[in-house]
Structures are given as C-alpha cells and as structure tokens.
C-alpha cells in the first residue's frame, strides 16, 4: 500500500510519459479522480475511465502526445505539498506557473481546482502540484 497516492499518481504519469506509453493504470481514489478530471479539462491528458478488478478500483488515463516525434503534452509534473511538509497558500499568493501556461492544482475547502479558478473564487488552500 502506498502512503502518498498523489505522488504515486504523478510519478506513474511522469514515467509513462518518458517512455511514451499511450495508457497508464493508477489505483483509483477520490483525489486521483479529481486530479484526472482537472488534467482532462485543461487538456493535459486525453481521457480517463475507472474499472474494477478483484474488488480494487483502477483509473486508466490516456496520455496525449503531439507531432510526428510524439512529444508529450505534459513537459513537467512536480509534487509540491508532501505528507512531511504541507504547503499552503492564500488566494493572493497563489502561484502563477510559466505566466499561466501551466497550472497548479490546489485542494481547497470547495474541492480540488486549478490555481486560476481558486484565485477567481478568492480562496486559498494546499498546493498539491505544478504541471506544465
């Protein structure tokens, strides 16, 4: 059993991107589903679906590539807040990633959302990861 499911998810996506796999399988949780939904809305992944196998739920994520050389859409994916060191930010100090070309995923009291939506709503929260 993995202690940090978010880091496990991000690492699996990063590794699959490096070897240009089309699909990556991740153990499903509420948080991983919320992160996958944001990645899909922002255009970083193609699609995702859940399935059950031996009473365990998994998430299948379809990764996106561009061009003939199949360059990954996700250039970098980085965990910020970790179980040993939580990172919080208020709405005024939410990070801008590459002048808003990338996103930060924030866990707020109103759910998991991007830094842009959290800033728009005027709420802060725990900075989970950066993606660009």
Swiss-Prot record:
InterPro entries: Ribosomal_uS8, Ribosomal_uS8_CS, Ribosomal_uS8_sf. GO terms for cellular component: chloroplast; ribonucleoprotein complex; ribosome. It holds the Pfam family Ribosomal_S8. One of the primary rRNA binding proteins, it binds directly to 16S rRNA central domain where it helps coordinate assembly of the platform of the 30S subunit. It comes from Phaeodactylum tricornutum (strain CCAP 1055/1). Keywords: Chloroplast, Plastid, Ribonucleoprotein, Ribosomal protein, RNA-binding, rRNA-binding. It is found in: Plastid, Chloroplast. One of its GO terms (molecular function) is rRNA binding. Part of the 30S ribosomal subunit. GO terms for biological process: translation. The keyword Repeat does not apply. This is Small ribosomal subunit protein uS8c. The gene is rps8. Belongs to the universal ribosomal protein uS8 family. PANTHER family: 40S RIBOSOMAL PROTEIN S15A. It comes from the Eukaryota.
């Amino acid at each position: 059993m993995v202690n940090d499911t978010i880091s496990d998810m991000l690492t699996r996506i990063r590794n699959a991107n490096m070897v240009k796999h089309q699909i990556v399988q991740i153990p499903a949780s509420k948080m991983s589903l919320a992160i996958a939904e944001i990645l899909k809305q922002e255009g970083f992944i193609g699609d995702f679906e859940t399935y059950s196998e031996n009473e365990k739920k998994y998430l299948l994520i379809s990764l996106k590539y561009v061009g003939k050389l199949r360059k990954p859409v996700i250039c970098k994916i980085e965990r910020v807040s970790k179980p040993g060191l939580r990172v919080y930010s208020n709405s005024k100090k939410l990070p801008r990633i590459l002048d808003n070309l990338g996103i930060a995923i924030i866990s707020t009291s109103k759910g998991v959302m991007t830094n842009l939506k959290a800033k728009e709503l005027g709420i802060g929260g725990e900075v989970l990861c950066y993606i660009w």
